[in-house]
Amino acid sequence: MRVADFSFELPEALIAHYPQPQRSGCRLLSLDGPTGTLTHGIFTDLLDKLAPGDLLVFNNTRVIPARLFGRKASGGKLEVLVERVLDDHRVLAHVKASKAPKPGAELLLGDDENIRATMLARHDTLFELRFDDERDVFTILNAVGHMPLPPYIDRPDEDADRELYQTVYSQRPGAVAAPTAGLHFDEPMLAALQEKGIEMAFVTLHVGAGTFQPVRVDTIEDHIMHSEYAEVPQEVVDAVLACKARGKRVVAVGTTSVRSLESAAKAAENGLIAPFFGDTRIFIYPGYHYQVVDALVTNFHLPESTLIMLVSAFAGYKNTMNAYQQAVAEQYRFFSYGDAMFISRNPRAPQEKVSP
């Protein structure tokens, strides 16, 4: 399967640089997986598409202000993007500099360069840094860090992004990118869903910067997926099994919830799904047999990305690429701050051939 099969033309003007004034005010393109039928609407239409007893599974990770600017004590500007917090004082980070710092190098970070850190070791593309400060990592980042807006949002982060680039139900700090399908849910929408009898459960997947990395191979099967930490606790497993037992749908909010649930399904030796705590490298592309997820709420993804491959595996390749063509023609807003899709699973998708 070729990566180029997942390419599409996207006018620059359709990339959303700011969210809608109201979270649930975005547009919603619904795709019926079995038939390929498309319906245009607004996000609050989701209320009519869900039935009492359906289970919405959200990712409750919280984005940390993970981007720091500064310089090496020996000179030379650099940019640090924290990928993973290891403990109160150590992190794994991407470091962008004209010359990479060596072990033992001292870094002066923050807009005032008053945060000292030491480069301890290099692990492939990541640098292990220690903050030489009494405060813990999260306190430091909240004080001096910048929100790590995606590379396609071509503007500096603003104070408002600390709230806007965050789901209203986020609880567990650790992500460097938002689970963006969840950005559309506001408190009134969540209350309306509960009132209708929609069940809710929360997984955690700390989204890493790897989610924005382009696929650098020609053949999909050669791609090595980045690793992210996920948690699917027992209460989520119980909620999924209860939902299936009553004949209702498990609806994943975002591709990170999909990857968490399907990782937990892979971990189950007996039965449909088991608790999962650990790193996942699950890579879902056409041919994959979904085990847990029946429907999906998701944003519009980058051409040739692993995420459009995941959606194609769910809805079917032809359905997905047709939906994206229609979204461009109808001028939907794309990517993190853009519009949303609601997709029901296409049971024939795993057998479908991928051909443009």
UniProtKB/Swiss-Prot annotation:
GO CC terms of this entry: cytoplasm
Localization, UniProt: Cytoplasm
Enzyme class: transferase
Catalytic activity: 7-aminomethyl-7-carbaguanosine(34) in tRNA + S-adenosyl-L-methionine = epoxyqueuosine(34) in tRNA + adenine + L-methionine + 2 H(+)
Keywords, ordered alphabetically: Cytoplasm, Queuosine biosynthesis, S-adenosyl-L-methionine, Transferase
GO BP term (any one): tRNA wobble guanine modification
Known pathway: tRNA modification; tRNA-queuosine biosynthesis
EC number(s) on file: 2.4.99.17
Primary residence: cytoplasm
Quaternary structure, from the entry: Monomer.
Its job: Transfers and isomerizes the ribose moiety from AdoMet to the 7-aminomethyl group of 7-deazaguanine (preQ1-tRNA) to give epoxyqueuosine (oQ-tRNA).
Protein family per UniProt: Belongs to the QueA family.
Protein name per Swiss-Prot or TrEMBL: S-adenosylmethionine:tRNA ribosyltransferase-isomerase
Organism per entry: Yersinia pseudotuberculosis serotype O:1b (strain IP 31758)
Protein encoded by which gene: queA
